[in-house]
Amino acid sequence: MSRVSDRVAEKVALISGAARGMGASHAQVLAAHGANVVIADLLEDEGRALAEKINAEFNTGIGRDVALFVHLDVTDYESWTAAVGAAVERFGTLDVLVNNAGIFTRGSVEDADVDEWRRTIEIDLTGNFLGMKAAVPAMKAAGGSIINISSIAGLVGFKNRAAYAAAKWGVQGLTKTSAMDLGPYNIRVNSVHPGSVKTPMTAGLKRGFGQIPLGRDAETQEISDLILFLASDESSFMTGANLAIDGGETAGNNLRQDA
């Protein structure tokens, strides 16, 4: 299969949590539009299989692999520096970082488990910080785009999601602050806030769609199309933005018709 376009031609993108779900979709869409992709994850078998699939599909006429799998524990800074180093060694640079890895946890302040709280913050927020810290030295010379995946739980309150919401709000704050700090290097930093998306992580959730004006979950492709835009030069004057992609769920209070 040949490329769909050259919107991110020859850019090098590292995506955390990319072995499956939204991360895998992001990697495939970026590769389809010309990027070299680094699939970073703890899931070795799935990550390597995805890299092989992308290489088989998108190296036609190029004569080399366009995807690389690297083992990554997002809570470990040395793991991050090794992943960035592998990306630069293989492809020569790093242009795009997609901080996609995350976990979804439940619990109010009253009943949340303390260890689970710490684990959620460590993966969903500190993991983003460590990824950015590791990536910036590789991006400083030529600039780049950092895309932090948050959630609508980082835009509004979320009942019974204390740790998850705290982490996702933290991602928004980290994004805005880092956009100010890294702007002089022409490194753009934006956050993406999906609503409910059809992924393995959300497959078991039971919910209605009364609060979503568009009346459905998002497809992973729809989120990936936004990632593609932010990774490309089409968004060259966007930084510090928090972009909701939620079918209108955070647009307002969708009251019952008889209210």
From Swiss-Prot:
Activity regulation statement: Strongly inhibited by N-bromosuccinimide. Not inhibited by sulfhydryl reagents, such as iodoacetic acid, iodoacetamide, N-ethylmaleimide and p-hydroxymercuribenzoic acid.
**Reported pH dependence:** Optimum pH is 8.0 for dehydrogenation and 6.4 for the reverse reaction.
Active site location: Y164
Q: Which GO terms describe its molecular function?
A: oxidoreductase activity
Q: What induces it?
A: Induced by CHCA, trans-4-hydroxyCHCA and 4-oxoCHCA but not by 4-hydroxybenzoate (4-HBA).
Ordered alphabetically, the record's keywords are: NAD, Oxidoreductase
Among Gene3D superfamilies, the record links this protein to:
NAD(P)-binding Rossmann-like Domain (3.40.50.720)
Which Enzyme Commission numbers does its entry carry? 1.1.1.226
Q: Which positions bind NAD(+)?
A: R20, M22, D41, D73, V74, N100, Y164, K168, V197, T199, T202
- What reaction is this protein's catalytic activity? trans-4-hydroxycyclohexane-1-carboxylate + NAD(+) = 4-oxocyclohexane-1-carboxylate + NADH + H(+)
Pfam families linked = adh_short_C2 (PF13561)
Its quaternary organisation is:
Homodimer. Homotetramer.
**What role does it play?**
Dehydrogenase involved in a cyclohexanecarboxylate (CHCA) degradation pathway. Catalyzes the NAD(+)-dependent dehydrogenation of trans-4-hydroxycyclohexanecarboxylate (trans-4-hydroxyCHCA) to form 4-oxocyclohexanecarboxylate (4-oxoCHCA). Is highly specific for the trans-4-hydroxy derivative and shows only weak activity with cis-4-hydroxyCHCA. Can also catalyze the reverse reaction (4-oxoCHCA reduction) with a higher catalytic efficiency. In the reverse reaction, is highly specific for 4-oxoCHCA and cannot use either the 2-oxo or the 3-oxo homolog as substrate. Cannot use NADP(+).
Identify its protein family: Belongs to the short-chain dehydrogenases/reductases (SDR) family.
Matching entries from PANTHER family are given as: DEHYDROGENASES, SHORT CHAIN (PTHR24321), ESTRADIOL 17-BETA-DEHYDROGENASE 8-RELATED (PTHR24321:SF8)
Q: What is this protein called?
A: Trans-4-hydroxycyclohexanecarboxylate dehydrogenase
Q: Which organism is it from?
A: Sinomonas cyclohexanicum
Traced from the root, the source organism's taxonomic lineage reads:
Bacteria, Bacillati, Actinomycetota, Actinomycetes, Micrococcales
Q: Which gene encodes it?
A: chcB1
